[in-house]
Amino acid sequence: MLLSVLLQATAAAVGVSKLGAAIGAGLAVIGAGLGIGKIGGSAMEAIARQPEASGDIRMNMIIAAALIEGVALLAVVVCLLVFFL
């Protein structure tokens, strides 16, 4: 009796964890997209104000975007590990 109840609870928890992993991966990707969009918009605005500093602004923009993508990739990998394990 107790074993069947525990098995049913475990099966339900697996479904919830997979749902949580999928939501987490989606939120990580959405957050990264919004962050990179904000960086791009701000960089274009800064380049429009000071065209002579475009090289430095572009370099900083690429570094910040790469860091955001790295964090997003790590979050997606963790969510995939939760999903499949």
UniProtKB/Swiss-Prot annotation:
Is Transport included in the keywords of this UniProt record? yes
Checking PROSITE patterns in the record gives:
ATPASE_C
Q: Where are the transmembrane segments?
A: 22-39, 65-85
Q: Which GO terms describe its biological process?
A: proton motive force-driven ATP synthesis
Q: Main site of residence?
A: membrane
Please name the SUPFAM superfamilies in this protein's record.
F1F0 ATP synthase subunit C
Q: Which terms does the record give in the GO molecular function aspect?
A: lipid binding; proton-transporting ATP synthase activity, rotational mechanism
Gene3D superfamilies in the record:
F1F0 ATP synthase subunit C
Q: Classify the source by domain of life.
A: Bacteria
Q: Name one GO cellular component term.
A: proton-transporting ATP synthase complex
CDD domains from the entry? ATP-synt_Fo_c (cd18121)
Q: Where in the cell is it found?
A: Cell inner membrane
**A Pfam family:** ATP-synt_C
**Alphabetical keyword list:** ATP synthesis, Cell inner membrane, Cell membrane, CF(0), Hydrogen ion transport, Ion transport, Lipid-binding, Membrane, Transmembrane, Transmembrane helix, Transport
Query: Mind telling me which residues the site (Reversibly protonated during proton transport) is annotated on?
Result: 69
- Topological relation to the membrane, as annotated: Multi-pass membrane protein
Q: How does it assemble?
A: F-type ATPases have 2 components, F(1) - the catalytic core - and F(0) - the membrane proton channel. F(1) has five subunits: alpha(3), beta(3), gamma(1), delta(1), epsilon(1). F(0) has three main subunits: a(1), b(2) and c(10-14). The alpha and beta chains form an alternating ring which encloses part of the gamma chain. F(1) is attached to F(0) by a central stalk formed by the gamma and epsilon chains, while a peripheral stalk is formed by the delta and b chains.
The record's family statement is:
Belongs to the ATPase C chain family.
What is the role of this chain?
A: F(1)F(0) ATP synthase produces ATP from ADP in the presence of a proton or sodium gradient. F-type ATPases consist of two structural domains, F(1) containing the extramembraneous catalytic core and F(0) containing the membrane proton channel, linked together by a central stalk and a peripheral stalk. During catalysis, ATP synthesis in the catalytic domain of F(1) is coupled via a rotary mechanism of the central stalk subunits to proton translocation.
The UniProt entry, under HAMAP family, shows: ATP_synth_c_bact
Name by which UniProt lists this protein: ATP synthase subunit c
